[in-house]
């Protein structure tokens, strides 16, 4: 029998992307609740319990409710794309390239928390340096990022695209999360293995999909004052053999006049760059990804495949 997949919240931005990715798969059976019944709690519970894997594409509180509907019904495995369980010790963190053995943890888990889009890029840059001992745990990490507006869901999409919307946003780029209390920070700190709360400054650009995440560092404050080549080598070794995460060669990065946030829009990969000047003792680590690809729906499908042994 084909494994049954239920996307709870398939009409939202992330859910629609996952549904599209699964539409042509003949090795799965996607079961869907009628749209008119999606607020029927009892019927939702029936669909959740009928699934081999339930992918939750819901706000945090709704995701917690969905999980509660499966209490005592352990045959359904869960992938939660919300923030609700990303730092919960009982949930496997769904970043397959995080560390050695992470793929296996995801494959064997019943509960998988899909990473956030921004943390995916930031952790991809920070975690290898922490694991290699180059980045001190107490380093004051700063993360600057820009995302396509689809990351804000249907409401922000409407505000950016519909000029007749009462809250239409004319800005081409805007900062948010100004009090430095963004909900992604605990996730970034925990899975980045950081002792100090990182400063996270996100922004949104007037483009639908794409993302750039930057982590600038002082080489002199890293263990052994490493060269750019050493930092690059650590990233390259960490992601060796991975088909989704690519570490761009130093010589290629050195020739780039710019990095385009939309380069990977519509794709599930992620590119990592090491920029900097040895003389100044500074390095800028950059992650490029699609906020709806490796940053959301693409990662959910990757995790689903691992859980199904594919």
From Swiss-Prot:
Cite the InterPro entries for this sequence: AGPR_AS, AGPR_type-2, NAD(P)-bd_dom_sf, NAGSA_dehydrogenase, Semialdehyde_DH_NAD-bd
Q: Which Pfam families match?
A: Semialdhyde_dh, Semialdhyde_dhC_1
Question: Localized where?
Answer: Cytoplasm
Q: Where is the active site?
A: 117
Q: Per the UniProt record, which residue ranges are transmembrane? A: none
Which superkingdom? Bacteria
- Residues folding into a coiled coil are none
Catalytic reactions of this protein: N-acetyl-L-glutamate 5-semialdehyde + phosphate + NADP(+) = N-acetyl-L-glutamyl 5-phosphate + NADPH + H(+)
Task: State the protein's purpose.
Answer: Catalyzes the NADPH-dependent reduction of N-acetyl-5-glutamyl phosphate to yield N-acetyl-L-glutamate 5-semialdehyde.
Name used for this protein in its record: N-acetyl-gamma-glutamyl-phosphate reductase
Q: Which organism is it from?
A: Brucella canis (strain ATCC 23365 / NCTC 10854 / RM-666)
Q: What is the lineage of its organism?
A: Bacteria, Pseudomonadati, Pseudomonadota, Alphaproteobacteria, Hyphomicrobiales
């Amino acid at each position: 029998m084909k494994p049954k997949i239920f996307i709870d919240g398939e009409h939202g931005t992330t859910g629609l992307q996952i549904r599209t990715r699964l539409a042509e798969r003949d090795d799965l059976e996607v079961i869907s609740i009628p749209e008119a019944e999606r607020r029927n709690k009892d019927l939702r519970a029936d669909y959740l319990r009928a699934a081999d894997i339930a992918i939750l594409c819901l706000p945090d509180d709704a995701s917690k409710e969905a999980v509660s509907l499966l209490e005592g019904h352990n045959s359904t495995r869960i992938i939660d794309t919300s923030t609700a369980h990303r730092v919960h010790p009982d949930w496997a963190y769904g970043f397959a390239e995080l560390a050695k053995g992470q793929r296996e943890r995801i494959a064997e888990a019943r509960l998988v928390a899909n990473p956030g889009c921004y943390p995916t890029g930031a952790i991809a840059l920070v975690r290898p340096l922490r694991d290699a001992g180059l980045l001190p745990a107490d380093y004051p990490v700063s993360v600057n990022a820009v995302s396509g507006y689809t990351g804000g869901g249907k409401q922000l999409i409407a505000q950016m695209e519909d000029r007749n919307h009462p809250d239409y946003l004319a800005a081409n780029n805007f900062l948010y999360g100004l009090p430095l209390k963004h909900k992604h920070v605990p996730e970034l700190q925990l899975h980045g293995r950081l002792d100090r709360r990182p400063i996270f400054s996100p922004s949104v650009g007037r483009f639908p999909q794409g993302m750039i995440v930057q982590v600038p560092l002082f080489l002199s404050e890293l263990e052994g004052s490493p060269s750019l080549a050493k930092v690059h080598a650590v990233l390259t070794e960490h992601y060796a053999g991975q088909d989704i995460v690519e570490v761009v060669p130093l010589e290629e990065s050195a020739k780039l006049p710019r990095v385009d946030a939309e380069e990977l829009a519509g794709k599930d990969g992620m590119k990592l760059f090491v920029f900097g000047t040895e003389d100044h003792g500074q390095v800028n680590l950059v992650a490029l990804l699609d906020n709806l690809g490796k940053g959301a729906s693409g990662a959910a499908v990757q995790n689903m495949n691992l859980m199904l042994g594919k």
